[in-house]
Amino acid sequence: MYESKICEILTHIRKPGDFRTPPKIAIISPTSYSRTVVADSIAREISVLVKRKNFSGEPFGKRELENLFEEHAVYVCEECQYLYERRPHGFDLLRLFLSSLVTNSRQVITTWNQYSWNFLSGFLHIERWFPIIITLPLLSLPELKKYLIADGKENLHFIIDTELDNSLELVRKDYDITISSLNLSFSIPYLTVQRRYASYIPLLADKQALPEELIFREIYRLSSGEPGIALKIFHDAIVEDEIRVTHLPKPLSVPELYAIDIFVLTLILMYELPVYSRLNESIQDKAMLNSSLYRLVSSGLVIRNEEVWCISLEGFAPVVDYLKQRRMIW
């Protein structure tokens, strides 16, 4: 997965005997799964030369950032959005980190949450610090199918055990535009009408689509092409050597929410480990926070996994679309 992106990053790694200052690299994706997979692959390729720093779980402060790039190595700094999202005065830490990128000659590869990066791009023009920006796109249906089959069990049986609703539905899509000369990327939303499932293979109207194709199409629709979410749905749906339509989660639609609910969803989407205490730091009225979490759980959009609150798998795509429409993320 993302082989071409990994190869592109490796071409920018400084070779022995090359004394030029290597470009700083930013890897961006909507969820942590994709960028973690790519970071792991890069670290394996340059194993003896790499030092990794993950800002989502390791303690750090001003002193650690000032001494971060002392050793001769290739640095992979992961989840860099938590430099400013984790604590008061976080933007001071972020600026210190960015300044240290400019003042050292080390090879530095960073990973970022897509929504945090978009905010920093509008607020700080953060792309100025990174000559090489690698965006990990959502997978297409054929790419997602190939990835899941490679990771799944052999000899799986795909079974359609319920009547499928093949009605027309209105789908929001984005047309991506990149202006290389301005180092600018943006998307234009548009609406299209399509059937929920393809009962027949295009151009072969007399040949019905296989159950395997219909099930992968539903997984793709539920995950919006996000490989980490699709992999979780795929594995959870496998019972012994069968995967049935009824094993897949039901798609959700987001009801009209209060402003506080939208804010809570935004916090959960941004934080790597959104435990209750962290949400309470942003929303200090516990009664208001508890009421919002109750509404979100009741609608199936949010679940609690031990101490961590997270957006449900089937709720991720509609929640992201909902927040984009209200300009909470972009």
Please report, for each region that a protein language model flagged, where it lies by residue.
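Winged-helix-like regulatory helical subdomains adjacent to P-loop NTPase cores
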Residues: 210-217, 231-288
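Conserved small helical "lid"/interfacial subdomain of P-loop NTPases
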Residues: 134-212
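Short, amphipathic alpha-helical interaction segments positioned at domain boundaries
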Residues: 315-330
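Short glycine-rich substrate-engagement loop in P-loop NTPases that contacts/grips substrate
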Residues: 47-72, 88-89
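Walker A/P-loop nucleotide-binding motif
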Residues: 19-39
